[in-house]
UniProtKB/Swiss-Prot annotation:
SUPFAM superfamilies reported in the protein's UniProt record: S-adenosyl-L-methionine-dependent methyltransferases
Subcellular location: Cytoplasm
CDD domains recorded: AdoMet_MTases
Record-stated family: Belongs to the methyltransferase superfamily. PrmA family.
Alphabetical GO biological process terms: methylation
Transmembrane helix among keywords: no
Protein name as annotated: Ribosomal protein L11 methyltransferase
Enzyme Commission code(s) on record: 2.1.1.-
Main location: cytoplasm
UniProt keywords, alphabetically: Cytoplasm, Methyltransferase, S-adenosyl-L-methionine, Transferase
Pfam family, one: PrmA
Name of the coding gene: prmA
Swiss-Prot/TrEMBL catalytic activity: L-lysyl-[protein] + 3 S-adenosyl-L-methionine = N(6),N(6),N(6)-trimethyl-L-lysyl-[protein] + 3 S-adenosyl-L-homocysteine + 3 H(+)
A GO CC term attached to the entry: cytoplasm
Length: 314
């Protein structure tokens, strides 16, 4: 990275961080930073409970969250801004509150960019066992902790978002030594890596986005894991065999579309761990699960989001 870069930022609300980040990843922009003051305010103060170290995040008007993406000055920034605005309108149609939804662009020097996004990521403890750590940060682990090494600048899934945390917490609860796990929409690979670290025998990550596939593979290499396979494509089109757990951290509408295929991909009694579900979409998802032969065994809430765990029963 040399010279001048363009920072495109969206001022939004916490519940919209994931889909808005996805807009930028869809533009093949690997350099995305998230600032979420609610993530700080909802946790006890301490170095391992804050994802973002810089307290000035809290100074955003109305505790707004911000997604920032960094583009080369050679990119057509005006077109990017208009595209982002169009996608924000689509997100609103899904019933997700994007808050202010302001899109801004400004020039930044390379050095400013590097300091600006990396300073926000610090080690974060997700469960008693799991700590997510950026690859450039030092961290002294205890004997019980499992460390996920991650480059947060690659694809969505850093451990900062409620949906990611709840999925990892569910994996911590349900993964056993002989478990096979499929991670649908694997993004950065964080959930696949968590499953492997927690002792899963075999893990398959699947994503339609080639950028996400490459990001997952890169992050897996940082963690020296050899029992994770990452594939590009749709679940049943590219995956052979069946899983004991399928995890999907995506939006409710896509979960409903996937449910029938997931049922076919699960062993009898297998679990479907899902998140990315806002409160008013919970009934839609649980009704689809019942229709497809799943029994809901757990619904967890964190902020505006829900994590539903369902069991394949027939």
């Amino acid at each position: 990275m040399d010279g001048i870069w363009i920072e495109v930022s969206v001022i939004t609300k916490s519940e919209a961080l994931e889909p808005i980040s996805g807009i930028f990843y869809g533009l093949n922009c690997p350099n995305v930073a998230i600032e979420d003051p609610e993530d700080l305010l909802s946790r006890d103060q301490g170095p391992l409970t804050w994802d973002f170290a810089d307290i000035n995040i809290l100074e955003h008007k109305g505790n707004a969250a911000v997604v920032k993406a960094y583009f080369s000055q050679d990119d057509k920034v005006e077109e990017i801004v208009e595209y982002v605005k169009e996608k924000l309108s689509e997100i609103k149609e899904f019933g997700i509150d994007i808050g202010e939804g302001t899109v801004e662009a400004k020039k930044m020097h390379e050095e400013d960019w590097a300091n600006n996004w990396k300073q926000y990521y610090k080690p974060v403890k997700i469960t008693d066992k799991i700590v997510v750590k950026p690859i450039w940060e030092e961290y002294e682990k205890n004997d019980e902790e499992l460390i996920i090494e991650l480059d947060p600048g690659m694809a969505f899934g850093t451990g900062t978002h409620e949906t990611t945390r709840m999925c990892i917490q569910a994996l911590d609860k349900y993964v056993k030594p002989d478990t096979t796990v499929f991670d649908v929409g694997c993004g950065s690979g964080i959930l696949a890596i968590a499953a492997a670290k927690l002792g899963a025998k075999h893990v398959v990550g699947v994503d339609l986005d080639p950028v996400a596939v490459d990001s997952s593979k890169e992050n897996i290499s940082f963690n020296n894991l050899n029992n994770i396979e990452v594939l590009e494509g749709n679940l049943l089109d590219v995956v052979d065999g069946k899983a004991d757990i399928v995890v999907a951290n995506i939006i409710a509408e896509i979960i409903c579309v996937l449910t029938e295929d997931v049922k076919k991909a699960l062993n009898e009694g297998g679990l479907f761990i899902t998140s990315g579900i806002i409160h008013d979409r919970v009934d839609m998802v649980t009704e689809k699960f019942a229709e497809c032969g799943f029994e809901v065994i757990e619904i967890n809430k964190d902020g505006e989001w829900n994590c539903i765990v369902a069991k394949a029963i027939n």
